Curated annotation (Swiss-Prot):
Assigned protein family: Belongs to the palA/RIM20 family.
Residue numbers spanned by region Disordered: 748-785
Biological-process GO terms, alphabetical: cellular response to lithium ion; cellular response to neutral pH; cellular response to pH; filamentous growth; filamentous growth of a population of unicellular organisms; filamentous growth of a population of unicellular organisms in response to pH; positive regulation of filamentous growth of a population of unicellular organisms; symbiont entry into host
InterPro entries the record matches: ALIX_V_dom, BRO1_dom, BRO1_sf
BRO1 domain ranges (all copies): 4-403
Pfam short name (any one): ALIX_LYPXL_bnd
Subunit structure: Interacts with RIM101 by binding to its two YPX[LI] motifs.
Organism: Candida albicans (strain SC5314 / ATCC MYA-2876) (Yeast)
Protein name in UniProt: pH-response regulator protein palA/RIM20
Record-linked PANTHER family: PCD6 INTERACTING PROTEIN-RELATED (PTHR23030), PROGRAMMED CELL DEATH 6-INTERACTING PROTEIN (PTHR23030:SF39)
Disulfide bonds: none
UniProt superkingdom: Eukaryota
């Protein structure tokens, strides 16, 4: 395209079988057959491939219009997909083209990023449509201006989305923003399109011979300001190439010079000849600066600039000569000139299609269950599992531990085993040995401690990474604060800006310290009972050798009855534990088999308006009634917990009463061998109790560290996003400081150049009255010379 304006090249994307990708997602995650959506899947594959095949257009407006409709149609499809699928369901690949040649492919597993890329394509396409319009007619200029504004609106839409994303601290998309979507790049493109839209208005104005110079000057200065903003953002972007930077710089200075050229004409018409010279000097200086940046700039742009420069130079020489010889007006400096106030005739227009909902009769995947329903079902399933754990597993485990401790505190069953089985291994010890071997014994605990150490190492690494991010921001902020000075570097320090994050990291450190102390206590407990566990794990023979025999004691009839009653109570305790184990197994099966998803689907299909607003947003709270109704499934089981607790309390009371009788009856019959055997048996019972505690401690420790990793990873992501936002903030602040300094420097240089280098004598000169050239002043004498 042979033009003095810029168009934005389209990104490139490889062909993707999007339909097949979505088919796999439906098959793996939805309770609906993918074959039901074959036509939709084929359609979306064809549409995505059409998008990938769109090329940069030339002057074929019909082809451009068709490409426009394809992109807008695909955008509507993406809006539907966002309601039906998770954001990370498919991976897309794009090539950036803003810099020197295609770069990539850059891969993104995000429907949001795909949507932004499509909007970027639409903005690029609108810029090309605008340039393809004729600039020799008012209609062509009007259409070009409209498309440039639409293009600017596309990039404004992208930038607004990025701003909201960065504000949202919990959005993981912050770290996935493509380089071509960074704020400086997008804003450069937006203001470039606005500048070119304003330029078409300016061109239409100069084509009108009756247009006032003041209006043209204001249009020119506003065009220059738009190019100036585009240039500022372009300088801070990594993708805007030198050709574009120089183009925008030349355009900025060109329209600055054009504005002052028009202002000089206005000054001359008002007999302000000093101001006329000053405006022309500013214009001359502007074109001189522009010519210094002409490298790589389009020849048409340079021709326009050179033509303007020639006019300015001629008028400046004439105006200076007339003022020096005739008018003798003092030439003011640039800062003393009346400011030219720009008038903007353009704005960023977001295409209406971006906000439109797809028509119900053309919407694809209409019968596909929205992914949020799956998400809600998963969340409620997790709540259900947590409910079962909290209301059933934890209470029953606590009751069992209380029962074991209750018996061990009363030396049961070791006290009666030492009497009734003076030589044989008690059944309870054999049972404990089998349970320990089934669990894995010492090897299992050793392995569990090693796994715990790995988790702990990962947790410490997470903590270190969080601290590193904060320390990195602190060092960067301190360095820039020293470089720029605290007067100009006005943003918050790291300790203030990251106050909440620092609190979270400190809390993480405290949790890990407490957990480490707890691990040490559990490890000591393990070493205390390790000898007993080795005996338990060594088999029947080792137990026989470890447990000493005792002498046979003939028991009185009354004591035998008491022991028999105790045995009966202990058997009931074992039965109680077995019943609880069977109850939990049955409960797990029932919980697994009763999924809440079918109920959610039924409720959603029966009354969609209740669960989904007109804007397509879901009312998650409305599903709560479905969950509450579903959880009534466990009402009867709650009653079982109360019953088994009451049964245990009754049994413990009965055992305690009988055991007191046993202790009183047995005191007179106990001998040293019997006492020694009872102590060993009691040690083994205590070791088994501590073994169960250690297993429970290790399980809790593993859960703690796993949860810590999950939550710590979220904190680390917050630190990453915080560091990213702070770096963007630093770059913007540095740019603002740099621009302010450059503006001050330019003003100073201009003032030095515009100062009048003439020395007048101390004689007072009477300034002649001003008059337009060619008019005779009747007060002057007639002279012939």
């Amino acid at each position: 395209m042979n033009t003095n304006l810029l168009f934005i090249p389209l990104k490139q994307s490889s062909v993707l079988d999007l339909g097949d990708e979505l088919r796999q997602v439906i098959t793996n995650n939805y309770f609906q057959p993918a074959s039901s959506f074959n036509s939709d899947l084929i359609y979306i594959t064809q549409l995505r491939n059409q998008v990938a095949q769109i090329k940069n257009v030339n002057d074929e407006l019909g082809k451009t219009s068709q490409d426009d409709s394809i992109l807008l149609e695909y955008l509507q499809v993406l809006n539907t997909l966002q309601n039906k699928f998770s954001d990370d369901c498919v991976e897309f690949a794009w090539f950036d083209t803003l810099a020197y040649g295609p770069q990539g492919p850059y891969r993104y597993r995000s429907l949001k990023i795909e949507k932004l890329n499509v909007i970027y394509q639409i903005g690029s396409l609108y810029s090309q449509i605008a340039i393809s319009e004729s600039r020799h007619t008012d209609i062509g200029l009007k259409r070009a201006c409209h498309y440039f504004q639409l293009s600017a609106g596309c990039f404004m839409f992208i930038n607004n989305f990025l701003i909201e994303t960065i504000k949202n601290k919990n959005d993981p998309l912050v770290l996935s923003i493509p380089l071509s979507m960074q704020s400086s790049t997008i804003q450069c493109l937006e203001y470039l399109m606005l500048a070119q839209a304003q330029e078409t208005i300016w061109q239409k104005a100069i084509n009108n011979n009756s247009m006032k110079d003041s209006v043209v000057a204001r249009l020119s200065i506003q065009t220059s300001e738009y190019y100036s903003k585009a240039l500022d953002f372009g300088n801070s972007s990594d993708l805007i190439k030198l050709e574009w930077i120089n183009h925008m710089k030349v355009k900025k200075l060109h329209f600055l010079a054009a504005a002052h050229l028009r202002s000089s004409t206005i000054a001359a018409d008002s007999f302000q000849y000093g101001e006329q010279v000053a405006h022309l000097r500013v214009a001359s200086q502007a074109v001189d600066q522009a010519l210094k940046s002409k490298k790589y700039v389009n020849s048409l742009v340079l021709e326009d600039l050179q033509g303007l420069a020639d006019v300015i130079k001629v008028r400046l020489r004439t105006a200076e000569k007339d003022n020096d010889l005739v008018y003798l007006k003092i030439v003011p400096q640039e800062k003393e000139l009346k400011t030219i106030i720009g008038v903007s005739m353009v704005k960023s227009i977001i295409p209406e299609a971006f906000e439109q909902k797809p028509e119900s009769n053309t919407e694809i995947f209409k019968e596909l269950l929205p992914y949020v329903i799956i998400h809600v079902a998963q969340a409620m399933r997790e709540r259900q599992d947590e409910y079962v754990q909290t209301k059933f597993h934890t209470p029953i485990s606590s009751l069992n531990n209380m029962l074991v401790k209750f018996l061990i505190d009363r030396d049961l069953p070791s006290s009666i085993d030492s009497i009734q089985q003076p030589e044989n291994i008690p059944d309870s010890v054999i049972h404990h040995s089998q349970e320990i071997l089934k669990t894995g014994g010492v090897d299992f605990i050793d392995k569990a401690f090693k796994e715990l150490d790995k988790l702990k190492l990962e947790c410490n690494h997470l903590l270190q990474e969080c601290e590193t991010r904060i320390d990195l921001d602190r060092s960067e902020d301190d360095m820039l604060r020293r470089k720029q000075g605290s007067t100009r570097w006005t943003r918050k320090s790291t300790d203030d800006a990251a106050q909440e994050l620092i609190k979270k990291v400190d809390k993480m450190k405290q949790y890990l310290l407490q957990a480490n102390n707890g691990d040490g206590f559990v490890l000591k407990k393990f070493y205390d009972i390790k000898p007993a566990l080795d005996v338990y794990s060594s088999g029947y023979k080792a137990l026989s050798q470890y447990i000493p025999n005792s002498q046979y004691i003939e028991l009185p009839e009354q004591l035998s009855i008491v022991i028999s009653d105790l045995r009966s109570c202990l058997a009931r305790a074992n039965t109680l534990e077995s019943e609880r184990k069977e109850f939990l197994q049955t409960l797990e099966i029932r919980s697994r088999d009763n999924s809440i998803l079918p109920k959610l689907i039924t409720e959603y299909n029966s009354n969609r308006s209740k669960y989904q607003t007109e804007n397509g947003e879901f009312n998650f709270n409305a599903f709560e009634s479905v969950y509450e109704k579903h959880m009534k499934l466990f009402d009867s089981d709650i009653k079982y917990i109360a019953r088994t607790r009451d049964s245990q309390m009754t049994l413990e009371h009965e055992i305690d009463s009988i055991n007191q009788k046993f202790v009183q009856e047995f005191k007179s019959l106990q001998n040293s061998s019997n006492e020694k055997r009872q102590q060993v048996l009691q040690y083994l019972e205590t070791a088994y109790e501590k073994f169960l505690e250690i297993i429970n401690n290790l399980t809790e420790g593993s859960k703690f560290y796993t949860d810590f990793i999950e939550k710590g990873s979220a904190v680390l992501q917050e630190c990453e996003e915080y560091l990213y936002r702070r770096r963007v903030e630093s770059r913007d602040l540095e740019l603002a400081i740099s621009n302010s300094f450059q503006q001050q420097q330019q003003v100073q240089e201009q003032n030095e150049q515009l100062s009048v280098p003439r020395n007048y004598s101390n004689d007072k000169l009477i300034s002649p009255k001003t008059s337009k050239p060619g008019l005779w002043n009747p007060n002057s004498d007639i002279q012939f010379s």
